[in-house]
């Protein structure tokens, strides 16, 4: 089970986008990386295709998961732990002790 999943609200802990928050849109567990909407934007040169025209486009680059943390209810970053509730393994916020997913 992953500590950070698609759809989680996260905050960036280090780097040029430190302090910015966003939603995880993709997780790459084999590379330990995640893509966050609107964070770590890079410019890519797009070759012309039938569907798209040529030009420079902005897109999100991936971040290492050690550089992001889930946002707790109070808006501060929290670590993630695991607990068994009703025979089911769930993620728990270390800061508040609340279950992250039902």
UniProtKB/Swiss-Prot annotation:
Disulfide bonds: none annotated. GO terms for molecular function: rRNA binding; structural constituent of ribosome. One of two assembly initiator proteins, it binds directly to the 5'-end of the 23S rRNA, where it nucleates assembly of the 50S subunit. One of the proteins that surrounds the polypeptide exit tunnel on the outside of the subunit. Part of the 50S ribosomal subunit. Belongs to the universal ribosomal protein uL24 family. It holds the Pfam family ribosomal_L24. The lineage of its organism: Bacteria, Pseudomonadati, Pseudomonadota, Alphaproteobacteria, Hyphomicrobiales. GO terms for biological process: translation. One of its GO terms (cellular component) is ribosome. This is Large ribosomal subunit protein uL24. Keywords: Ribonucleoprotein, Ribosomal protein, RNA-binding, rRNA-binding.
């Amino acid at each position: 089970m992953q500590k950070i999943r698609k759809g989680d609200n996260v905050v960036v802990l280090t780097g040029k986008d430190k302090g910015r928050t966003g939603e995880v849109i993709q997780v790459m567990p084999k590379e330990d990386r995640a893509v966050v909407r609107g964070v770590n934007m890079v410019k890519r040169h797009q070759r012309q295709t039938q569907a798209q025209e040529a030009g420079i486009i902005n897109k999100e680059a991936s971040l290492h998961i050690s550089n992001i943390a889930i946002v707790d209810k109070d808006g501060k970053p929290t670590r993630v732990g695991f607990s068994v509730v009703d025979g089911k393994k769930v993620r728990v916020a270390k800061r508040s002790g609340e279950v992250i997913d039902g």
